[in-house]
Amino acid sequence: MSVNVSVTDGGVLEIEIDRPQARNAVNGEVAEGIAAALERLDAEDELRVGILTGAGGTFCSGMDLKAFVTGERPWAGDRGFAGITQRAAEKPLIAAVEGYALAGGFEIALACDLIVAGRDARFGIPEVKRGLVAAAGGLFRLPQRIPYHLAMELALTGDPIGAERAADVGIVNRLVEPGEALAGARELAAQIVRNAPLALAASKTVVQRAREWTEAEAWDEQGRIAGGVFGSEDAQEGAKAFAEKREPRWQGR
């Protein structure tokens, strides 16, 4: 299989692109595998967080150009390129990046909610060097998240930046030593899993959609999305656990 999926005891779904001989380039099988894993993540209540990584010390080098020239298209339904860029997971998803996250590989990472990277990782959209366009989200997601001029430099030169620079400008959440990205992502996932499922879902939705709203719309939409959380059993449990100085026992309702 080109995509390996496993579940930890803590309710974390780990998705590994396993084509190290091709630097984890995305072909049709990878796209379908990631899409299926994300469907599972969202469908199973016991799964709380996802981690997406690559085998063999490389995250992903983008689209498999050899497969592309033969007519293969690495899209998966409405999820888009690699089964993720147009519709990612509803639950939190962390990219654990080692080595290269280039072209579509960078766009996959940008489709995730959080990025943990080894200090020697490299990020870039070199499509212009190949007569192509970074059309899997990179060209509009980057200027939403980093300064305009840096986004334009990455888009027009095709040159990559290192993980430390990526962290400095806000692309990477946590830097770890080379080879420790997955461990770092697991640590971050464990922090997230400790929190209430309904509150996590509402918080992610509001943060994701905030840039679409005016301030007036934001208040209304936040109230609609988050209002039910305050009357939930989990909200009551959170208050009780705090008062009783114990860990909460979330029910997701």
Model region roles, listed by residue range:
Residues A22, G54-A89, G131-L132, W213-T214, ...:
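Glycine- (often His-adjacent) and acidic-residue-rich active-site loop
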Residues E32-A35, P74-R79, Q208-R209:
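Short gly/ser/thr-rich secondary-structure transition/capping motifs
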Residues L154-A155, V206-A210, I225-F230:
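Helix-loop "lid/cap" segments that line or gate small-molecule binding pockets
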Residues I15, R19, G33-I34, L52, ...:
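Terminal peptide-recognition signature
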Residues R87-L200, G231-S232, Q236-K240, R246, ...:
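Crotonase-fold acyl-CoA enzyme core
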Residues M1-A55, A183:
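Conserved CoA-thioester-binding segment of acyl-CoA-metabolizing enzymes
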